Amino acid sequence: MRVALLSESPADEAALRLLVEAVLVESFAMVKPGLRARGWPNVAQVLPAILRHLHFNTDADGLVIVVDSDDSVVHTAEHEAPDYFHPQCRLCQLRGIFRRTQKKFPPLHGRDRVLRAVGIAVPAIEAWYLCGQDPQVTELAWMEGQARAQAPYTRRDLKWRVYGTDRPGLGFEIQRAMECARRHRDPRRLAADFPHGFGAMARDLRGWRPRDAARK
C-alpha cells in the first residue's frame, strides 16, 4: 500500500506513521505529499494542492491527515449524519476540502481518487501519546470541560507531561512521539478514549482495505 501523511510537524508525522500501521496491521510505502504544512490553518491551505499532486503525479492509494483540535468544536457522532457540516469542526472542514477538490478529478493510475483518512487529536496529539498512562486525559474529559468553560488541562500541560518541557527540541520531540506511538500497537484503547478524533481516522483506514486488495 502506498500512503502519504500530512500533519502539523515532523514529530506528529513520525508518530502518525506508526499509528496508521497499527490500525492497518501492516506496513506501507511512504509517498511524499509534495508540500509540507506547519500548524493549522496551513494544513487546510495546502491540502488542495497536495491532493492534486498525489492524484496526478503519484500512484498513492491514500492520504492520512491528523491535526490538533485546539479550542475548536470537537467532532461528534452528530457530524456523521449525511450532508451534515459544522463550520467550526476541523474534521468536517478537511473532509469538505477533500470532496470539493476531488469531485472533478478523472480516474488515473488505476483509481478513481486518492483515499481519505482524517483524524483530529483532541485537544492536541500529546493527548494521544498519554493514552493508557493518564486516565484523566480523554476526549470526553475535554468535551465536558468545554461545556463547563473550564478545561481539565491545557495543551501546555500535555506537553510538560510528555516531554518534561513545553518547548522540546525537534529531535527529542520526534523521539518521544515515536516512543509513545509504539505503545499503541493495539490501537483499541486509543479508539475507546478518543472515539471521535482517533476513531474517525481508524474507521476511514479500515474502509481502505477492500480496494487495496482489489488492486493487488
Regions found by a protein language model. Name each.
Residues 2, 13-34, 48-216:
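C-terminal accessory helical subdomains adjacent to catalytic cores in phosphodiester-
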Residues 35-40:
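Conserved helicase motor
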Residues 8-9:
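Helix N-cap/beta->alpha junction signal
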